[in-house]
């Protein structure tokens, strides 16, 4: 509205304060969700990597985390390039509109705690995956600039609950005595996905076409959904 960058910074500051307040209010909702995991004592010695891999569902959750990071980080790093080089936005517009993805994540994380009142972790993860899928489809189909931007917001909203819910559900899937070790390899998988998958898409964008961006995301999402469903099956946590 012609007020310049100081007004923009003030608006962002107000938004951050509001979202922080919402996050603080929602914290008890996350803590209030009980799990049926065994409350075993921590093992006397740490599990080796080989022992962790032998736990039913461990490999699946690692791949799911890897693919989640692929979706989130590839979107965060390449959305602006996709908007500028394929969707028809100017460089300045693309740089600004790419932030809609982060707004989606921030708002989604703020409200994720409230979802636990009605839903458990697998349900919330599935909901997030569904929202991500809708967002990617909005990017993939030639629906116009408006729906492209809506797609970025939806991808952010869908990503928001997946990471915390996978972590939160770890004791339920693997038991309290194994959860610390499994969370460690989950985080390692997430970091590997962050380091590997965005540069891999960079090669695709440079040598083929940046238009493959939504296809790359939907393939990563498909593997994540598959691995999460396999995890639920192996851990006996299938939803009725």
Q: Where does each model-flagged region fall?
A:
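Symmetry-related core transmembrane helices of the 12-TM Major Facilitator Superfamily/SLC fold
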Residues: 7-26, 214-230
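Flexible cytoplasmic inter-helical loops of multi-pass small-molecule transporters
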Residues: 25-50, 240
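Extracytoplasmic gate region of multi-pass secondary transporters
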Residues: 56-99, 103-106
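Helix-to-loop junctions at the C-terminal end of transmembrane segments
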Residues: 108-120, 205
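Structural signature of the two symmetry-related core transmembrane helices
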Residues: 123-138
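Paired small-residue
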Residues: 135, 146-154
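Intracellular juxtamembrane helix-capping segments at the cytosolic ends
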Residues: 161-174
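A late C-terminal transmembrane helix in Major Facilitator Superfamily
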Residues: 173-210
């Amino acid at each position: 509205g012609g007020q310049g960058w100081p007004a923009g910074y003030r608006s962002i500051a107000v938004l951050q304060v509001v979202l922080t307040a919402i996050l603080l209010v929602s914290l008890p909702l996350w803590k209030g969700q009980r799990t049926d995991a065994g409350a075993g004592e921590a093992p006397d010695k740490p599990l080796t990597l080989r022992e962790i891999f032998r736990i039913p569902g461990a490999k699946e959750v690692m791949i799911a985390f890897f693919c989640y990071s692929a979706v989130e980080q590839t979107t965060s790093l390449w959305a602006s390039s996709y908007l500028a080089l394929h969707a028809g936005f100017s460089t300045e517009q693309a740089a600004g509109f790419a932030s809609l993805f982060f707004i989606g994540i921030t708002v989604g994380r703020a409200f994720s705690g409230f979802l636990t009142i009605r839903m458990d972790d697998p349900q919330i993860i599935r909901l997030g995956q569904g929202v991500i899928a809708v967002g990617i489809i909005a990017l993939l189909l030639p629906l116009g600039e408006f729906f492209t931007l809506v797609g970025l917001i939806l991808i952010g909203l869908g990503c928001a609950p997946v990471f915390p819910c996978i972590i939160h559900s770890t004791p339920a899937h693997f038991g309290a005595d194994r959860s610390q070790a499994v969370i460690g390899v989950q985080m390692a998988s997430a970091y590997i996905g962050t380091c590997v998958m965005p540069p891999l898409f960079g090669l695709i964008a440079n040598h083929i076409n940046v238009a493959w961006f939504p296809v790359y995301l939907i393939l990563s999402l498909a593997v994540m959904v598959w691995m999460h469903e396999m995890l639920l099956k192996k851990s006996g946590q299938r939803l009725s």
